[in-house]
Amino acid sequence: VIGAALNLRTTKSDGMCNGKLLSLWYNAGEPYHIDPLTLDTYGPETFDGHLKHTLSAHSKVDLNTGELLFFTYGNKAPYMTYGVASPLGELVHEVPIDLPGPRLPHDLGFTPNYTILHDFPVFQDEAVFKQAGKRIVRFHPDVPTRYGIIPRFGDSDAVTWFECDPCYLLHVINCWEEGDWIVMDGCRQPDPVNKPDAADGDLASMLAQRRRVFQLYRWQFNLKTGEVREHLVDDLNTEFPMINPLYGGRRSQFTYNQYIPLLEDGGRTLKFEALVKYHTDTGTYERWDYGPGIYGSEAPFAPRLGAAAADAEDDGYVLTMTTDVSTWRSECLIFDAGALSQGPIARVKLPQRLPTGFHTRWVRGEDIYQACQGC
């Protein structure tokens, strides 16, 4: 279940903390400090020797405080750990989180005062493991999804758990506070384990896991009464959401997602065919299709130079890397976030082909060079 425990070679996602570019893995491996220009590896990041375990990808930096909020998980009780690192890269808070057993969380959400942790009914079949020693992960639709809301610096017993309809969630869009309520938007999977298509032959099982249903969804949790509200916002198949990072943990309206066609719409795997700007309150959207045989990547938001959180939420640019499979040439497309459906305002031809897909991150040039100086 866990990458570090199984000694797996891993592909990596990324994160920034204390001016350092960190290479992270969702199956919980060691965080590695790498050079942002050369990608040279400097070694594991240990927060001055205080980090004694692995770190999952999708740890989050609160830009208002500079704090890194993280979690990790494993095969042994209590199965999850939650923590906070300071803007200086110091481990300032860490608590165990009790789960019913080994789980496969992928992301977390945060607000100015709380962190939202995930416990999904997606875990290994214990009967198969005991009989054959094989780790077969299954979706258990009779088990509720749980979201644990903990004060940012709360103890283990401060977690409040909320039960919701069974599902899986790869990526949170954003979370915020509204009085006694915590609101979380994300791209929900009603059933994360798809049936193989015989037409795919020997690759059927692998392709099935890359052909998933994602739906824009909203959860609301009342910290005072324990009430839960949840509803579908829109069913267009999109994922890999990105928001204006200045709005992380604050009330937001827009998310920039990738359209991934379903099998009945001609989709065969996780290929990003269009960029979609959603209004998350209404489910309305505008869309830009990349074109036949052209596939994109996750599209980070770059705030306009000098923009502040008080400015318009879509005051900035959205960027994506595309590859044309007929020529194997790649470009960086730059969109005005306020007029996405009008198409890119600039195209930058890249000197070599890039693999399409996830994940990407926007980092200001001055932050890149600051990170280099700290290497």
Residue ranges of model-derived segments:
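Beta-propeller domains
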Residues: 1-375
